[in-house]
Amino acid sequence: MSQLLIIKPSSLGDIVHGLQVATSLKVQKPDLRISWIVRDIFAPMVRACEAIDRTYVFRRHDGPAGFMRLMDQVRETEFDYVFDFQGLLRTGLMTWRAKAKLKAGRSDARECAGLFYNRKVPLPPDGRRSHAMDILLQFCPVLDAKPELQGMVQFRPVEGLNLNYLESRSGASPVVMFPDSRRSEKKWHGFKELTEAIARDGSGRKIVWAGNAYVDYKDAPPESVFLNLTGNTSLVSLPTLIKRACWVICNDSGPLHLAAALGVPTLGIFGPTDPRLFGPYPLTAPNNHVVQAPLGNLKLLTGKDVYARFQKLDGGRSRTAVPFPQRGF
């Protein structure tokens, strides 16, 4: 049995990509045991992934003493391989402190992290213009595995989690939206307009807003049509929530990549970032779709524009528009 340590503390979208690569490695190398160093805020996602055997939690705010305590735990195991998926000084130092025969990192590592590797993984043929997933897949040949995704990432069930209330009275799966983004330039402000258009389209589906940060929606549609779970969406519940959806619509953010990893139809809304590099992977998959704002400016993208695209992707079925009572009037 070979032991692999993956170092990828953040962020959510990058971690999802890494979990997909780990899953592919497990499929191709069933005897491989995979451990992972991850930031505390993302640890529940990594712990829940069936491909990961052990999780080491990095608490950034614990300072140098906390870093050394973490690495003391890591050094209790002698690994065969260490993969630094992040390629920054901090993760380079983690690679240096870990015990392993082979320490591999990205050839485009920054902050002198490359000094701590004894093997540098080449970039794909398109170099830095490659999709983030394709860059991570180049680590697979280090283990004599093919640089391709095999198998679908799986998550352990969450005990006691019941999401049946998300379905409409007809039993239709909901449209799940994630209206928030950590970066303001990636945050589209047309989700209310899009929500109201879908709520009136006659499909009978609920629209669910989700995310860890609360997003206010004044005069929202009634609860029979709309549910706001923003601020009440735990990371560990995210895979189950997304798998219940018939569509996931969101900004360029972690949930978009998780939905793509789980095979759920996705519509990503992109502004300044390039979907060819950061979109749902792969963009050629029949369930993965994006809308790019004109000139990369999300202020120029209307809810009407996105709804027209969604309607076309959703099958263009003719439905009877249904009004819903407005609140606050």
Spans of features found by a protein language model:
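Catalytic machinery of carbohydrate-active enzymes
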Residues: 1-329
